[in-house]
Structure formats: structure tokens, C-alpha cells
Amino acid sequence: MAADISWDEIKKENVDLEKIPVDEVFQQLKCSREGLSSEEGRNRLQIFGANKLEEKVENKFLKFLGFMWNPLSWVMEAAAIMAIVLANGGGRPPDWQDFVGITCLLIINSTISFIEENNAGNAAAALMANLAPKTKVLRDGRWGEQEAAILVPGDLISIKLGDIVPADARLLEGDPLKIDQSALTGESLPATKHQGDEVFSGSTCKQGEIEAVVIATGVHTFFGKAAHLVDSTNNVGHFQKVLTAIGNFCICSIGIGMLIEIIIMYPIQHRKYRDGIDNLLVLLIGGIPIAMPTVLSVTMAIGSHRLSQQGAITKRMTAIEEMAGMDVLCSDKTGTLTLNKLTVDKNLIEVFSKDVDKDYVILLSARASRVENQDAIDTSIVNMLGDPKEARAGITEVHFLPFNPVEKRTAITYIDTNGEWHRCSKGAPEQIIELCDLKGETKRRAHEIIDKFAERGLRSLGVARQRVPEKDKESAGTPWEFVGLLPLFDPPRHDSAETIRRALDLGVNVKMITGDQLAIGKETGRRLGMGTNMYPSSSLLENKDDTTGGVPVDELIEKADGFAGVFPEHKYEIVRKLQERKHIVGMTGDGVNDAPALKKADIGIAVDDATDAARSASDIVLTEPGLSVIVSAVLTSRAIFQRMKNYTIYAVSITIRIVLGFMLVALIWEFDFSPFMVLIIAILNDGTIMTISKDRVKPSPIPDSWKLKEIFATGVVLGTYMALVTVVFFWLAHDTTFFSDKFGVRSLQGKDEELIAVLYLQVSIISQALIFVTRSRSWSFVERPGLLLLIAFFVAQLIATLIATYAHWEFARIKGCGWGWCGVIWIYSIVTYIPLDILKFITRYTLSGKAWNNMIENRTAFTTKKDYGRGEREAQWALAQRTLHGLKPPESMFEDTATYTELSEIAEQAKKRAEVARLREVHTLKGHVESVVKLKGLDIDNLNQHYTV
């Protein structure tokens, strides 16, 4: 049969599968309601192709050349052109050695970038393949879950809540669907689709469940045709903007240095043309951090792979830097903070109908549950039966209403053995109570039981029933009868409390966002040690009543430990308000209605087993359950970010150091350094610095982000110091006999070739050693670097020392200085290295604002969304609050003598901030009352409460 069908036969010009009756669709596609066979599906797959959009085939060679097309590479390419075009005078041939060296350096950097990005891309593709959209398809007469890519016209598929429609299809018999087509049509509200209507690939099912027949796949779908007509736009991310800013700073620094050299060398000093060009080449070659794009890209690629090994797949690479800066995490309760393994305590079941016992309440709730594709609630209830088959024993299912976030209940219409029609429903107790229109004493009793369950951390599930005398699934039936309440217990994960404590210590405030009752949220928060300062979702409305103590909504959201009774639209509002308060927000989600909040959040996190819609909207997809995966990802992200920040400070420092140092030597002593030797320094530096992507680092104990002020200021200070150290060294070697007198080495006065050798080695050693200073938060000799970085450093400096000792290259104007001078240079470098750490501390201390507190209160270097500079004020406030409420002061995070280091200082501040977060509950009106009650031993039941309950 498959051989008799082709795309030409079913093209819209020949037949409009979107408009013709559904029965004719089956005829045109030569299929039936029994679905296709596996063999027929494979044959049609050969004819119609895979159900996915065409992927652009990227030219590998052009991609390789693309790594040479950026501002930093342009400067190096300009230097290469200068070496053979402008450096052609004074009776000397073009500088072919520098041209070849620069070209090799460019090719090496591009090759490394190309290989690493290609490997990272392949790894990401393999990981994302595991997350490829799947669909329920009827093949060989059996329903099964398959990858959406295998769908062909004629397949029968099942679409349910949370699914992304995998292909264009026509709906068969069933209840209407609510379909979100905003990604395709721009419609803001979901469209209602009935039997016979078409649904488009890429739209999202918001409500309902139905079967459909596929009419178009891949590039032939509505979405595929639209995507084929437009090219995707590449938005410039924050990371790229930072990269550009640092690159521009380095280029401007080099430009200023070259301009000063040109003005002084030619009009004032009347230097030879070729000598001047050589000096300009020194600044160009040595000052450009040509390896920066490569190092940062490789670091992120390797980091992304490590995150995936921990169970967090990054869909967007720059989400790593945002994860490092996250300071608020809004977490789901069910499945993330808890196990999502519900149990029903039969002894606590409450029965409301006179002719019903507890077993019958369980049976009714099991009938209103799915027997396949079950969620956690359905599984727990059906498993209460002796045999799960009892859920459908003796009845004929007529219609099943699946759960949806709006109605928050399921229902089944069925026929019993006597031919009578019945309907039963289970769901959120508030919805079932409203459905049954309970009043008076019955309603009061139901709420008392719900509250009693909630106080013990138990969720409630309402069960109701009705008769359907009209024997029609669409009829309203008799009034609903409230049958009973079931208690559900979802135990917290064993590691949740410890994970939340770790998050607080890392400066990440965890807020519980749950759809359960407020009392359940509070009880769970109490068990997890995350605080009970929680509010109902109604408090998110812009009205200041007694429930919030008149606190503005945005401040309430910031200070709350969580919110209960939350709907998806509330999640979006919570994220928006927190972002307005300058927080970097992470949001977890799993359902289709979580997608807006996941997109709005700085870091959208799709939890394990999330729907396709949630995964599509997220930045990070978890492959393991629980909050610990997220906290581990935060630590890893901060480590990755720390490596990138360490390198950028190093790159800026080296630019300033090369430009200022060699400019002063060239202008003060009219000494012409060899461009080729600067090229050797650059090559050895780049080879060493590549290993920083796998360096050992201590993640920041607080949320971190790009602080350009700190990067530029630290780079300028360290670079200027190293430049002055080089100038002093050159003065001592060129104009004095200091080294000869103190160390017994021969004088180098008038020996320019040997001066180039000693100057080369001095610049090489301290330039590469700088990475140990920028990579550490405390003393560089305290924080052990990675073995790979150490090996690379010593190998590079061994090569540099051998060159300085033995090299006799006339084209580079260098002659070996001997082992004596090499020993002197190493001693000088070690002595002048020590102040680098001190300068680093002074710069950070100055930028932190502590040195200026008398002039500007709490000036900080933090330029992220959140004002972390208020740490000291909050610490003082926290101490005062503890004293007021009779609490002991918090213990210090570190009790050793190394409190001088910035690491321990910042870690201590992080601990204080965590303490502040816990004390916020005491600071609120509600928290204050609870605190006084606990302190004075009052009976809270006898108090007149005027705060959120």
C-alpha cells in the first residue's frame, strides 16, 4: 500500500487534507483507524522523510575561517599585514618571520576553537537526542511511545495535556482540545479545537485528550513551511557583549599606546621608519588577547559537559553565567522538595455518605483515575486496591475527563452491570466542595478535616459521585454527592533540608511555590528548615489587607519563604516582581502552564519528567529529580564562571603590561625590542592559558556575575605594576651594575641582543605567573592550581629559559644570556611576584567600598541585579533582631586563623545573608507574633490572629 502513495498525491494543489471530511482523509492517505504497521511506517518514512525541519548543512571550512573573523583576530591580521607590507624599509626585507608566526598563532587558536566547539556541539546533540520530543502513536494495532521524528502521514497519534503537537493532524472523536497556537499565529488565547479540526505542529495542548490522524510532517507542515521562508535571527547575548567590551578595552589600550609611540618616535625622536614599525608590532602582537574567545568558549563547552554529567543539560550555553548569578530559586514542592511518591492512609479516610464505607471511597477514586499513563496521585490510589484491574472491573467506561490545571479534577462517566449510568470525580478538595455545592455543617466539617490533614502535612483529595439518568455523556446528571476525603502524604526528600541549607549558605534564597494549601506548605517548610513565612496566592493581588500586614506586594514576594495555592499565572507574577527588585531568578516547572514563567525567569529549569512544552521553554533541563541537582549545578556554574572571570582579568592585565612596559622602554631608552620574541611570549602564554578551562577553582560563596569595573580596575592595577617592574629591571640591567655587583653576572651595558634575551625571559615569567594571582581569591600560593595548569606553566617557562640561555637568532636580534643571568631573572621575578597578591587585595578592598564608607555609605563593586553591598547593614540588623528575640548569635562559618583571606570573609558574609533570610520571618508582623508566642510560651489558639494563616 505504501508504494501507492507519494507526496505529490496529497499536495494541497491536488487534495486539501485540511478541509475534506475526516473519512476522506483516511481514503486519501490510504490508512485506517487501526493505524499503520511498522513496515508500512518505515516505507512511508523513506517517501516523506523524517518528521523534523531541514537542518542547514554547515560548511566546516567556512566555520573554521569564522573563528578568524572577529575584532581581536582583525588586529592580529592587521599586524601580519604590517609585518610584510609596512615593515619593508631601511634596507631590510619584509618581516616574514613575524608574518608566519602571527599566521600560525591565528591558525592554532582557530583550530582549537573549531575542535572544541565541534566536540561540544556533538556532545550537546547527543544529549538533546535523549530529550527529543516523543509521541504516543498507534503502530501494529498497539499504542506505544515513539520519537516524533518517525511519524508519517496516515499515523494515528494521541494528544494530551502538555504535549507539543508533533505534526499537522486532523482530530478524531473526543472532547474538544484547548490548543495554544501563539508560537504560530500570535493568538494570545488558546483556541478550542473540535472533532475534524486541524491542529498544527509546534502548537501546545493546554487542555483535553484526543486521537488524531497525521496529514503532514516535517517541512510540509504549516510550521515547517513558515520556518523555511525565514532565517533564524541570532540575538547577541550578554556573554558576547561582555566579550566585546573587554576586547574593545584591550584594542583601545593598544591604540592609545601606538598613538603615543607614533607621536614621540617620529616627530620628536626622529627614529628610523623600520625601527618604529617594529615597536608598533610589539604592542600589536603582545597586547591583543587573541586566545580570549577560544579560552572562554572552551571553558563553557567543557563546563556544559560537566553539568550534563550531573544531570543538568544546558540548552543555552550562556545560561551557565546566569546560573552563577542566581540569587533566588522558586522551586516546586511536589517532586522537587518532596519525593512525589504519595501514600494514602486508609485509617484517616473521612466518609461523608451514609451508605458508603472507606473501601468504596477508595474504589470510586480509583475509577476516577487513569489505569495507564498514570500520574503520582493515580498510581497511589489504584495501588490501594487489591488488584489494580478492579478500577475498571464490572463497569464500561463511556468517557474520561483528564486532569487539567483549571478544573483541578478528573472524572469518569461509566455504565454499571445493571445498565445504569454513573459519574464520579476526584480532585482538589476546594473544587470538589464547590462542585457538590456543600453548605452549612457539612461544608464546615469538610474544611475542618482538610485543615486537620494540612496541619499534619497531608494533602487532601475530594471524591464525589452522581447518577446520569439521561444516559448521555454530555448531560449534567443529578446533583453531585460529596462522598469523602482521602489524606495523601508526600514525604520530603531525604536530602532536601541539607540542600536548602547549602543553597542559603551559597546566597541563594529558596522559595517554595506550591499549589497545595497554605498549611501544607508551612508544614513542609518547617520540616525542611526553610521557614514558614508563607502566604496564599490571594496575597499576590494588589490589595493591602490584614493577610499581608499592609506590606507592598513586591516586598512581600521578596521576603516570603513561599506561596501556596499557586496557579501558573501566579508563578509568572512572582518572577516578574522579583526581577523588578533586581534579583536574578531561577524557576522550576514541569507542566505546560509553567512555560510562561520558565521563559520569563532568568534561568528556566525544567525538572525531571517535565512535559515537552516545559522543556521547550526552559534554559536547563534536569535529568534527575530533586533540588540537590540544581544546587550542584549552581556550584558547577560558579566554578565555570570563576575560570572565565579569572582569565579575563589576566587578559586585561597582560594587555596593559605589554603596552605600557614596552612603550616606556621604547620611548625612554629608545630600545627596540624584537616583535618575534613578543610573538614567542604570546604563543607560550596561549598554550599555557588554554589549560585554565580545566583548572581547580573554588566557586564563589555568593552569586557572581560579570563585573567589568572590577575586571578593568584589577587588570589596570596589576598590569601597571608589572610594566613598572619590567621598566625597573631594564633600567638596572641597562644603566647600572646592580646585578653584576650583587650576583656576579657580567654587565650587559651596550649588549642589546643579550638585553633582548633577559627582557624576554623576565616578561615571560611574570606574565605567565600572573594567572596564579588572578585565579585565586586569597593568597595565590595557598590555593592549589590544577595539575594541568602547573605542568603547562613549567614546560612553557623551561622553553622560555632555554631560549633566553642558548638562542642566537640573528633575525630576531637575540643572543643567549647564559645560566647566570637566567638565575638572576628567576630570583627577581619571584621577589616582584609577591606584591601582586597584595595589590589584588587592595584593589578588591577599595572596590568593595569599605575604604570609602566615610564618604559613600556601603559603596560596592557588585554591578549585578542585586545590591549585595548591603550585607554589612543586614548583618548588623540580624544581630539586633537576634538580641531582641533572645536568640544566640550565629556561629562563624570559619574558625581557623586564616580569616584574613577574602574567601573566608565573603563566605562569612554569605552565612550572614542566609541568617538574614531566616530572620526575615521574625521581622514580618506574622513572624513577630509567632516569635513572641514561642518565646513567652503562649497558647496560640487563644490569640486573636490578624495575620496570614
From Swiss-Prot:
Quaternary structure, from the entry: Binds to 14-3-3 proteins. The binding is induced by phosphorylation of Thr-948. Binding to 14-3-3 proteins activates the H(+)-ATPase.
Single GO term (MF): metal ion binding
UniProt note on tissues of expression: Expressed in guard cells.
Function field: The plasma membrane H(+) ATPase of plants and fungi generates a proton gradient that drives the active transport of nutrients by H(+)-symport. The resulting external acidification and/or internal alkinization may mediate growth responses.
PTM sites of type Phosphothreonine: 883, 948
Alphabetized InterPro entries for the sequence: ATPase_P-typ_cation-transptr_N, ATPase_P-typ_cyto_dom_N, ATPase_P-typ_P_site, ATPase_P-typ_TM_dom_sf, ATPase_P-typ_transduc_dom_A_sf, HAD-like_sf, HAD_sf, P-type_ATPase_IIIA
Species lineage: Eukaryota, Viridiplantae, Streptophyta, Embryophyta, Tracheophyta
UniProt family annotation: Belongs to the cation transport ATPase (P-type) (TC 3.A.3) family. Type IIIA subfamily.
Gene3D superfamilies, per the entry: 6.10.140.890, Calcium-transporting ATPase, cytoplasmic domain N, Calcium-transporting ATPase, cytoplasmic transduction domain A, Calcium-transporting ATPase, transmembrane domain, HAD superfamily/HAD-like
EC primary class: translocase
Topological region Extracellular: 85-96, 268-276, 668-672, 733-753, 808-815
Chain residues that bind Mg(2+): 590, 594
Name of the coding gene: AHA6
Active-site residues, Swiss-Prot/TrEMBL: 332
Compartment(s) where it occurs, according to its Swiss-Prot or TrEMBL record: Membrane
Keywords associated with the record: ATP-binding, Hydrogen ion transport, Ion transport, Magnesium, Membrane, Metal-binding, Nucleotide-binding, Phosphoprotein, Translocase, Transmembrane, Transmembrane helix, Transport
Annotated catalysed reactions: ATP + H2O + H(+)(in) = ADP + phosphate + 2 H(+)(out)
Official protein name in the record: ATPase 6, plasma membrane-type
GO biological process: proton export across plasma membrane
Cytoplasmic side: 1-64, 118-246, 295-645, 696-711, 775-786, 837-949
Residues with Phosphoserine modification: 931
Chain segments annotated as transmembrane: 65-84, 97-117, 247-267, 277-294, 646-667, 673-695, 712-732, 754-774, 787-807, 816-836
Recorded topology in the membrane: Multi-pass membrane protein
GO cellular component term, pick one: plasma membrane
